[in-house]
Amino acid sequence: MTNFSRSKSTGTIGFPEFKPTRPGPDKYENIHNDDDEYEEGHSTTSTDYYDASTPLSSHASRSGNGSGSGQLTVVDLLAAVLRKSLVMSCAMERGEDDVVASMDIGWPTEVKHVSHVTFDRFNGFLGLPSELEPEVPPRAPSASVSVFGVSAKSMQCSYDDRGNSVPTILLRMQKRLYTEGGLKAEGIFRINPDNGKEEHVRRQLNCGVVPRGIDVHCLAGLIKAWFRELPTGVLDVLTPEQVMRCNTEEDCSRLVILLPPVESAILDWAIGLMADVVEHEQFNKMNARNVAMVFAPNMTQMADPLTALIHAVQVMNFLKTLILMNLKERENADAKARWLKKQTSDPSEEWESQHSEILSPEKPNNNNPKFLRVATLCRLEADNEEEFWNIKKRNDHEGVLDTSSGNGNIGPVQRLCKHPLFQLSKSTKKAFVSNRDEGRKGREAWSSRLSSLPW
């Protein structure tokens, strides 16, 4: 705003000094003509009026009062100054004050680049100054002050058992849920926790600390809250039409491939968590449908409540199919592992492990009554075998075994026959004894017949 001041000669700064003179008689006609023109132009626009009253107008139009023309000029100047001040105040009220104020702010001076700090998803803050390390942990759970409501791309991540890149805070909560017995808690992920406890645990999780002795239902509720408070849902990339047309396992597999890498890894981790809960259904009463039902509303975000409810039902069926597929993959993997172990194991070791209890009856397995019964039968068979060999010794005339050697040494054939592998079972020995008796009787009958024939 330009400031005006009076000089000693009643002039203005920036304008030449003006000395009014009395007009002559020949100029009165011009004065009257100017007054007529003023009256005609007064009804046009206010701009003409302002222009006519500016300090730059001719002195002839304002010299009608003679000696008072100098005072009129000062009044006009003051009016112009007030008019400009009003215009500037109106412009500042319309928001132009920001533009004017920005011109008064200069560029920063004496700036020094101390350090360059970046956040890595796997290593946390990199390049952190040493004076800030006590306040900010180098492996912070998130680049933000909170782990909730933050994108997974700006959080510290780790790898799970399946090789998925998952936020570390989720893996810590999962581990603590398992160690606290959450898989066997009835109604896990379905029972809502206490709000007071949840807020306290939230503050600790924002610092990257999972407290011990936490309520498993509170921890399960925070896992669902993490998915619910994401900026974008895990399944928001998929349209409702795509999820609705997903009816078979093949359709679900093709639909998972369409997800971005970050969302796909988080979904696979979540499906594994749900499958672990379903495996303990006999304790927690949560089957595949129940777990999918409580997780479905947290996987998508929609503004319309009715549309969100309909879409949640479709997402529930999608999650249920993925859970059943995960359980089937686990069963197939376990069966394959058992088959490979059986193929790679030594046959002799396997035979010894299977017959260790039978071959050593003096060390029966007291925890298994079946093996105890087998050991008892083995001892009975051993007694029968001893009686059988005593019968053989008494029947030396039949030539079955030669036990009357002069030096008392046992031959190699006899030593081989006494090996446990070649000892007969009870039923076989009975059959052998009966066949031997029948053969002896048959030979005696043939010998009597032959003796009765007339030679």
Swiss-Prot record:
It is found in: Cell membrane. It comes from the Eukaryota. PROSITE patterns: RHOGAP (PS50238). One of its GO terms (molecular function) is GTPase activator activity. Expressed in differentiating xylem cells. Acts as a GTPase activator for the Rac-type GTPase by converting it to an inactive GDP-bound state. Involved in secondary wall pattern formation. In association with ROPGEF4, mediates local activation of ARAC10/ROP11 to initiate the distinct pattern of secondary cell walls in xylem cells. This is Rho GTPase-activating protein 3. It comes from Arabidopsis thaliana. The gene is ROPGAP3.
